[in-house]
Each structure stands twice: as structure tokens, then as C-alpha cells.
Amino acid sequence: MTNAASEIGTTTSTVSRQIARLRETLGIYPFVKADGDWHLNPALRDLVTAFEQADGMLESELSRLQSYQPTAKRDVKIGAPPTVLSHMLSQGIREFVKNSPGIRPVLESRILESGLGTTDISVVFHPPESGRVRVKRCGVLDFALFAPKGWRNGDGWVSLGERVAGPYNQARRHFFNSDPTVLVDSFPQAIRVMRDIGVAGALPVIVAAQEPDLELIGPAGLDVTRDLYVIHHETRSTDPDIRATVNWVSTQLTDAKRKTRELREMQNRLCDSPA
């Protein structure tokens, strides 16, 4: 419920009351617990699909009507991990706004979500396994280990929490021979800690490239590459504003992928060069 409340910008008690009312209306529990987590009741999948389809068709029709008002701006909500927003999409936002005067991009940070939630378009690590969602793989987010100049193994390391970094931290514990010295909830926080107390940490390559005082420390076996998928609902595919925004997001991710590869090659050369 905490995650759901955060997703829609309300409190857990409000979510709890809404679920209770929904149960009364439907006559069944809307969610069931399986494998230690809550999932949509399978009996409601067709109902949810019908709502999503109706919502998508309504939004597309509203967009068509707005085309008769050339000065009106339409919000298109784009969800993505914070690094994608700050280091990939933000790079081309000025040109997009200039070329698409009828669209106002609304950027929303989303980390582990796999669906659209309340967004029109999302960039996700894992696309939904079901539902009428269009999926396009068109980018990557590369991670590697970095440290301030002069760092030596044994000086410690910083990590994001287990919810985000957990799948990768066992190998990092083995490399550093210790648990993380500090846990943080964002990469900007990690960079501040790295500078303040001289510890190492895993960072997105595209982020670390803008921090000249941080050096790649390897090893390559601990590098991580995450695919990025652009998703939107199938019923929005004919919506010109959605199409334009999806094309822009896809182009930004593709360009960032190329730049990241170039940065990675340059960092590897610097790391391998004699001191």
C-alpha cells in the first residue's frame, strides 16, 4: 500500500479506504497475495483491460478535439528512472518543446515500476508481461564502479538500498570484502558521500562521466547493463501527441546509448593506461 500511495500521491490510509470501497462495489477482493507480494485478482483482468482501453480512447479523442485549439497545450506525462530524466531526456527537452508547441512534457521519477501507472509513456527496466501495452527496447543504462582519486580497496563503499541494488550487491561485497559503509537512496547522494568520506560506489556511466574527480576502478566483471524499454498503451498509438513524444523519447535513449558506449571506451582506455 505504501508503494501504491506514493505512486498516486496520497496516503496509505486513503489507499486502504479506496480498496475497501472497491471490494464492496465489486463483491470480491481486488488484490490477492501470492509469493509474498500483492497482485491483481485474476478475475479482474478483463475489467481492468476494458477500463484501460476506454481511458486510452478517451484521451486520444480529447487530443483530436484539442487540435482545433492550436494555442492549447496538452500535458503528456512521461515516467522514467531519475537518471534517465536528468541525463538522457533533459538533454533534448528544449528542442522537443520548440518543435512540439502543443505538448507540455510532465516528467515523473519512477524507479522499479514495470507498468504505466498514471503516466502516458514510461521508460522501464522490465516491460509488463500482460496487458495491451506497446513495448519498444531502445536504450541501456550502464553501471560501473567508481571512486575518488587516491581510493584504495579497504576505504569502503556506498550503495543504494537493497530494494534497488540488492541483486548486484553480493558480488560487490565480495570485491570490497565488506558490507556497504553507507546506504543512500539516490545517485546524487552517493556522489556526495563518495566525495565527503572517500568511498567507492557503483554509478551510471553517463552520470560518472560528468564527475571528473571520480575514476573508474573496475573490474569489468562487476559492470551492469540494464535494457530500457519505452511503453505506452496500445489504444494511444493513433494519438499524434503520444506518437511524437514516444519518438522523441526513443531518439533520446538511442543517442544516450551511443554516447555511453563512447564514454565507456574512453574510461577503459584511461583505466588501462600507465600512471
Language-model segments: which ranges?
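A short LG(V/I)-centered, amphipathic sequence patch enriched
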Residues: 23-42
